[in-house]
Regions:
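Active-site-proximal alpha-helical scaffold in enzymes
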Residues: 75-87, 138-142, 146-149, 154-190, ...
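Condensing-enzyme catalytic core mediating Claisen C-C bond formation in acyl metabolism
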Residues: 5-9, 32, 36-37, 212-289, ...
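Conserved beta-ketoacyl condensing-enzyme motif
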Residues: 8, 23, 29-160, 189-198, ...
Length: 412
């Protein structure tokens, strides 16, 4: 029995380098970072991928905004952009049972939680907004998307740290294969630029303390990398059953072919020294996609710009692909838009779909110093045209969570 196939027909990124498909893609082609100076107060972090031009009142009424944390705003608007890109019709007045939502976030409504805690300290319990409960819980992403657009199919928000966005795409594939729905809005959103979040990560010394130009702070695979740079934003993808997409003449960017998720069961912040679980995640995603390792044409690496992660991921990729790892491009793209935690995997899935659609490999920007432990073709600083048929995208998160998706060129 043939499997139902899932394709990407809509893309809606919201990042510090641009909102919407073409603004985002043009910023990628410009090969410049969106990371800027950021005041973290008493902490040593001085850079972030902050979205400075965000105006939620452009999209929501004042009454609606009272129920939306910043991360949920990103979720709903990115979904709107993706649905418009896919040219899918929707209506709250005519709910659809065969459209679902699969979303991811690491921290959920942490912005509103911190804001309201400070209000509580100043004004007591009566100073706290009565809508706080519906603003802070992690499931508000998919719930608000479903409410906004009338989607009554399968719906969930996962919280798998930095792998959350990739998990949302992979679970969307499963929803379609298993015939739960015909269309899924899949993505991730995060708004973590709060004192409590930055402080928590800065204290354990995982974040960059780059003292110079903040645009250069995130430098995946570079010898001088000194930690990840936190960002905010989101991305949604419309993932649709193939024949459903064809029946309405939709433009198909890419096909979602394979997915895997597992756990290290080792340490909350350090990967397994031998990379066993990340290796298995990549191999199982390839098996799910029914591909051999040598069929992969490009890997969008997790490449968080930490010393340990980038070198460990390099070793794992070489273990999975063997000699083929030296023949293909492997770039880390967080130098553009930083690391918006649970949103990142969705942003990078969107980027990979566009790479397949436009046949162009995005570069690793801010790369100046070769690291012998990261001895792959990292596409330094400048992207290139390439014949791309199959792409792998990795997300490896705190808690030892490893997720991988494989995308393919749009079927003819």
């Amino acid at each position: 029995m043939s499997r139902r196939r899932a394709v990407i027909t809509g893309i809606g990124p919201i990042t510090c380098i641009g909102h919407g498909r073409e603004n985002f893609w043009n910023a990628i082609l410009a090969e410049k970072s969106g990371i800027k100076s950021f005041d973290s107060g008493v902490f040593r972090v001085r850079a972030a991928g902050e979205i400075n031009d965000w105006d939620p009142e452009q999209f929501f009424s004042p009454q609606r905004l009272k129920r939306l944390d910043r991360y949920a705003q990103f979720a709903v608007v990115s979904a709107k952009l993706a649905l418009e890109d896919a040219r899918l019709e929707y209506s709250r007045e005519k709910p659809q049972d065969r459209v679902g939502v699969s979303f991811g976030t690491a921290l959920g409504g942490v912005c509103k939680a911190e804001e309201q805690y400070l209000r509580y300290l100043k004004k007591g319990a009566r100073g706290v907004q009565p809508t706080l409960a519906v603003q802070v819980f992690g499931g508000s992403a998919h719930s608000n998307i479903a409410i906004e657009f009338g989607f009554r199919g399968a719906g969930t928000t996962n919280s798998n740290s930095c792998a959350s966005g990739t998990v949302s795409v992979g679970e969307a594939l499963r929803y379609i294969r298993d015939d739960f729905v015909d269309v899924v809005v899949a993505g991730g959103a995060e708004a973590p630029l709060t004192t409590i979040t930055i402080g928590a990560f800065d204290i354990i010394k995982t974040m960059s303390r780059w003292p110079e130009n903040p645009a250069l702070a995130c430098r995946p695979f570079d010898l001088l990398r000194d930690g990840f740079v936190m960002g905010e934003g989101g991305a949604s993808l419309v993932i649709e059953e193939l024949e459903h997409a064809r029946s309405r003449g939709a433009h198909i960017y890419a096909e979602v072919l394979g997915y895997s998720i597992n756990n290290d069961a080792f340490h909350m912040t350090s990967p397994l020294p031998n990379g066993e679980s990340s290796i298995r995640a990549m191999r199982e995603a390839l098996t799910d996609a029914q591909l051999a390792p040598e069929q992969i044409d490009y890997i969008n690496a997790h490449a968080s710009s930490t010393q340990l992660n980038d070198s460990a991921e390099t070793a794992s990729i070489k273990q999975v692909l063997g000699n083929h790892a030296q023949r293909i491009p492997v770039s880390g793209t967080k130098g553009y838009y930083a690391h918006p935690l649970g949103a990142t995997g969705a942003i990078e899935a969107a980027l990979c779909a566009l790479a397949l659609d436009r046949q162009w490999v995005p570069p690793t920007i801010n790369y100046t110093n070769h690291d012998p432990l990261c001895d792959l073709d990292v596409v330094p600083n400048h992207g290139r045209e390439a014949e791309l048929t199959y792409i792998m995208s990795n997300s490896f998160g705190f808690g030892g969570i490893n997720a991988c998706v494989v995308l393919g060129k749009a079927p003819q």
